Amino acid sequence: MSQDLNQDANSVAAWIASLLKQRGIDRIFGLQGGHIQPIWDCLGKQGTRIIDVRDEGAAVHMAHAHSELTGQLGVAMVTAGPGVTNCVTAMANAALARTPVLLIGGCTSRPQANMGPLQDIPHTEILAPICRYSRTARVAEQVIREFDEAIARAFGDLGEPGPVYIEIPTDVLRTSVKKTLIPKDWMIPKLIRKLYPDPELIEQAVHLIRQSKRPLVITGRGGKNARYELTRFLDTVDAVYLDTQESRGLIDRNNKAFVGAMRAAAMNGADLVITVGRKLDYQLGFGSPAVFPEAKFLRLADSTGELIDNRRGDVEVLANVKTSLNALSDVLNMNAGERDSN
């Protein structure tokens, strides 16, 4: 155990601060508290910008906004007990928005667990239903591995992106861990595993597109990183395009496919609806035949949550969205102008 944390470059708190810096985190939003003070000290020492708030929920909302605007991980840090519970609404919002947010919380020391210590609340159980990852990191030598896994989950490794939560007992934060016990690969970003589209499904999707006369493309959060691929696909398909709140600004409003008004008419008149990383929720009439009376559905997404909802797709492609859009454009461009007659 280190007696002077500020002099121990190998404390768990110092390792956490170093990891965040190596992952490109230049600012953290939060409200100071005793349970997390060791991390704050290390962050300040290394020059990370700390944005102080007056309510913990605001810290998570700000981290959420930062992630939305930059594409980076948003990080918030709060103390134990009410510090964490004040974040529940903001974390639920990040979960529904599928935004990468890391919330770091404090918790009581291991020797005092279940003895009635200050602000001892089951944070991980409270947050688990709305987080991709919710853990207490109790083993000092494994804390950085836990952070590595949590951040990968936040960015959608093996599932949807979304908020994650990690808490570290106060005694663990002050524990010194030798450099030889921290593998280098824990400190660098994981390569997010990519799903590739089934060629048979791509062929079926192309058949649907060639049959259609009035295709409509609707994007959501799952398509937000595919600007180039989506623009190319729209040019290839010659479809009408609708954005949603989740994908506003993805496509230039001057693009010939863009429809800013008469959106209801566009949905009502489509004979093929192509959803790109978009759930059929209340904003899209739940995919109801009353809204889309003549449409078949082609669903593209990299997570099941954006495929399995209120309307089954005639063709569903569960794969990386960029790769799927490029695959469709490639096949369609092989025989430009060809359409099945029906």
Where are each of the predicted segments found?
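N-terminal alpha/beta PP-like core and its mobile active-site loop of ThDP/TPP-dependent enzymes
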Residues: 2-340
